[in-house]
């Protein structure tokens, strides 16, 4: 997915800003946090974060959850380069492994309702003829 932040700001400007941040804030990493397109989760109020190097991915997810006021029954997932980073990993480790060439770490978040409110399955929409070739007695 293309980053809206990248679309709005030229590479040179992003790189200069990330370099300035790295020089000024040695104990923080610059992170751009954006919602996955077409996700059914609220939009975050700000995209740019200076994240402490000792913050875990799980703690950062908590920050995102609070900023978007996500109800407890909704799940949230974050992705870095299409990878779901381990919850216990430090942001600094993820940054070193996945930072963009402009110096920012790009984090995408998405959500789906996985707790409590499951939609009923409409059995009338299933093509039962596909199951006629199964010989369950052999198994």
From Swiss-Prot:
GO cellular component terms listed in the entry, alphabetical order: autophagosome membrane; cytoplasmic vesicle
Protein's UniProt keywords contain Transit peptide: no
Q: How is it modified after translation?
A: The C-terminal 23 residues are removed by ATG4 to expose Gly-116 at the C-terminus. The c-terminal Gly is then amidated with phosphatidylethanolamine by an activating system similar to that for ubiquitin.
Q: Which UniProt keywords apply?
A: Autophagy, Cytoplasmic vesicle, Lipoprotein, Membrane, Protein transport, Transport, Ubl conjugation pathway, Vacuole
Q: Which residues form the propeptide?
A: 117-139
Membrane topology field: Lipid-anchor
| Compartment list | Cytoplasmic vesicle, Autophagosome membrane; Vacuole membrane
| Listed GO biological process terms | autophagy; protein transport
SUPFAM superfamilies, per this entry? Ubiquitin-like
**According to the Swiss-Prot or TrEMBL entry, at which residues is a lipid covalently attached (Phosphatidylethanolamine amidated glycine)?**
116
Record Pfam families: ATG8
InterPro entries from the UniProt entry: Atg8-like, Ubiquitin-like_domsf
Q: Where is this site: Cleavage?
A: 116-117
Q: Which family does it belong to?
A: Belongs to the ATG8 family.
* Entry-linked PANTHER family: MICROTUBULE-ASSOCIATED PROTEINS 1A/1B LIGHT CHAIN 3-RELATED (PTHR10969)
Job of this protein: Ubiquitin-like modifier involved in autophagosome formation. With ATG4, mediates the delivery of the autophagosomes to the vacuole via the microtubule cytoskeleton. Required for selective autophagic degradation of the nucleus (nucleophagy) as well as for mitophagy which contributes to regulate mitochondrial quantity and quality by eliminating the mitochondria to a basal level to fulfill cellular energy requirements and preventing excess ROS production. Participates also in membrane fusion events that take place in the early secretory pathway.
Name of this chain's protein: Autophagy-related protein 8
User: What organism, scientifically named, is this protein from?
Assistant: Scheffersomyces stipitis (strain ATCC 58785 / CBS 6054 / NBRC 10063 / NRRL Y-11545)
């Amino acid at each position: 997915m293309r980053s809206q932040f990248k679309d709005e700001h030229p590479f040179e400007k992003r790189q200069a800003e990330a370099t300035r941040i790295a020089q000024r804030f040695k104990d923080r990493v610059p992170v751009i946090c954006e919602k996955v397109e077409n996700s059914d989760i609220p939009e975050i109020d700000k995209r740019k974060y200076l994240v402490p190097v000792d913050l875990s991915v799980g703690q950062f997810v908590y920050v995102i959850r609070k900023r978007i006021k996500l109800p407890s029954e909704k799940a949230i997932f974050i992705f870095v380069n299409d990878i779901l980073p381990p919850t216990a990993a430090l942001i600094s480790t993820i940054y070193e492994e996945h930072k963009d060439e402009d110096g920012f770490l790009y984090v995408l978040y998405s959500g789906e309702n996985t707790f409590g409110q499951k939609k009923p399955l409409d059995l009338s929409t299933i093509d039962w003829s596909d199951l006629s070739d199964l010989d369950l007695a052999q198994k």
